[in-house]
Amino acid sequence: YDAWRLQFPPYRASHYHDHPEISYSMAWNWCINLARHCELYIITEGEFRDKIEAVLPTLPQGKHMHFYYNPVSEEVRKMCWNQGDWRFYKHYKKWQWKTYEMAQEIIVKQHIDIVHQLNMIGFREPGYLWKLDKPFVWGPVDAKEKFPTAYLRDAEIKANLFIRLKNHITGLQLRYSQRVKKAVKKASVVTSASSESQKSFKKYFHIDAPLLNETGCYPKTTIINSTKEKGDLNLLWVGKLDFRKQLPLAIKAIARQANPHIKLHIVGGNNNSYQKLAMELNISHQCIWHGVISHNEVQELMQKADIFFFTSIAEGTPHVVLEAINNNLLVICFDICGHGDSINEQVGIKIPLSTPQQSINDFAEKITYLFNHRDVLKQMSENCRVRQEELSWDNKAKQMVSLYEKVLSQE
């Protein structure tokens, strides 16, 4: 049957990467995998039109992907990339309306079975495709209720106020946004990007929204690191050095153990305050700062590391966590967001949200356990191969197609 994908934002909905297994484009990966099962009519922003049209003829499923472009200005594109720039939503709303008008024209000319609002994953701007007289699918959607404020203790005043304001606005929008309500009501199915989003849809809209994290991976064969059986325990931390990522928790957890044989490798932009913290805690010799490095170099570090230490408390489903699993790397993280759903007890260890100090203690306890039980570490690494298949793009696409079939069977 024909299915119609409608997606955004600029760049990420359309950006083709030469190596799909390391692509940053969530929507592109959805498209190339769904196109193995469906005929896709795709509306997207046009910055990477040349790259899209160059690669389509090289893909076996490319003949099933029909692109329509709704470009925006360079100014709006910059706003899209500048996360936190709320001005973007004004332009995004206009883009969604134009997309709706384009969709109306396509429906007249093409046989369309399903309309799918795929991207962006945020719930705040549901677009207008639900107004079309076609079965409507929305998601995966990120509708987390709020940022965990217990972790604001060490935040700067500006960040503290911004996050509390955002929590308040999120609550208001979940309760009162009429277009969100209309989109949910019209949808034949809404998929949740995380367990927290599932809870929000149940609480505010009284629907069951099946869990389907928004990103996937491409399983690969990686030799398991033999150094896991002895010697130093090498932890890898990768991320943007901002407040959400909570790097201080990782540094303090290492200091809490007072074990010089536990090393923390840190990949991310320069921030002297974090290096200063390591000095104050007398663990500078245990922290290896790699700075900003290439994606390939990150993969090399993952293949050498023993544990991927992910301390973020506010995410969608971070691709870097799936990359860790792809490298047979055990993950320690919070049981929250998409990474909490992606990591199960076979491939990692999760701790609950609590307070910063309790989290430091919990992380330290788990790391010490793994330091002393290398057999557990090795077994979890071996288990990653099965989890790769479960989280693969191929499996994600099949789950979505199953939902399409269910929707059409009810028409």
Language model segments and positions:
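Glycosyltransferase donor-sugar binding loop
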Residues: V238, K263-K276, G291
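Short alpha-helical donor nucleotide-sugar binding micro-motif in glycosyltransferases
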Residues: V184, V292-I293, E300-A305
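Nucleotide-activated donor-binding/catalytic signature segment of Leloir-type glycosyltransferases, i.e.
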Residues: L59, Q275-N296
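Donor nucleotide-sugar binding/catalytic pocket of nucleotide-sugar-dependent glycosyltransferases
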Residues: M65-Y69, W138, I169-I224
